[in-house]
Amino acid sequence: MASEPQQPSPYPYATPDQPRQLTDEDLTLLSHYTGEKDLDKLREHVLNIWKAVKAKLWVYACIQRLMFLQPRIPTHDFYPQALAALKSDPDLLVLDIGCCFGQDTRQMILDGVPTESITSTDITSDYWEFGKDLFKDRDTLAVHEAFGSFTDPAFTAAGGPLGHLSGRVAFAWAGAVLHVLSEEDVRAFAKHVYKILASGGVWFGTCVGSEPAGEWAATPNGDAKRYLHSPTSLKALLQHIGFSQVDVVGSMPAEMSSMNDDMVQSGGQKTMLAYTARK
Ligand SMILES: C[S@@+](CC[C@H](N)C(=O)[O-])C[C@H]1O[C@@H](n2cnc3c(N)ncnc32)[C@H](O)[C@@H]1O
């Protein structure tokens, strides 16, 4: 299971017993979604979940930093367009790929996307199950869910867990996923996203990038090196696969400048990439 570390964590900051202090802003989504207004109660709840996750699972940098509380999908320029379409046509389908705890799934629900339209998927159900405790919706969450690797052709092929969606998905979202994959796996992942999209469907997402592109830390199972694309190399890959109207933009949000200081130092200058690509 990918969430079980086969190697020591590459993050020098992944060892403290306590995470950083939670701000009120960190708790905005959780408070809106659960209806819990007592933020101190939520702080304690998050801390308990974080400790349980840390004891059992691979702790990605974004988990260590409690970034799973903050929805990422609203930060993408394409989201308003996808949201408007999904709200106006309940037949349109959306995937949250690499959903982890599922903060973006919950954000879409809060924003009015019909739960029937959403499929949340990840290589493992481990974080997702903790997400049901975190968001306190184990008995009410009505989105579709499917678990397996998007790099595996069988996952999206006929008869596979997502085979029934092949060629039918209007929007595929992948927040902060590509940078945990090897170069070969990014290619396979992108091919399978292309396949599952309907004609005219859009893949949009974010990932850590590097200028120049290159290998980075080891993947969680230790088998390969993760690959960080540059805007140019990711655009070329997506166009090669068949996507059109590909747009890849690099930026340097505050969280990234600190990552350049304390993440494993290899490859070029790290940036955050936001991409949009149409089938
Ligand atoms: C860095 S986390 C980002 C999670 C979340 N989307 C976010 O924005 O916070 C990367 C996620 O990708 C998932 N993942 C890794 N490899 C995957 C694969 N081959 N197929 C699907 N999901 C994968 C991980 O399990 C993890 O949940």
Predicted segments, located by residue:
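Class I (Rossmann-like) S-adenosyl-L-methionine-dependent methyltransferase catalytic domain
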Residues: 2-165, 184-186, 192, 201-279
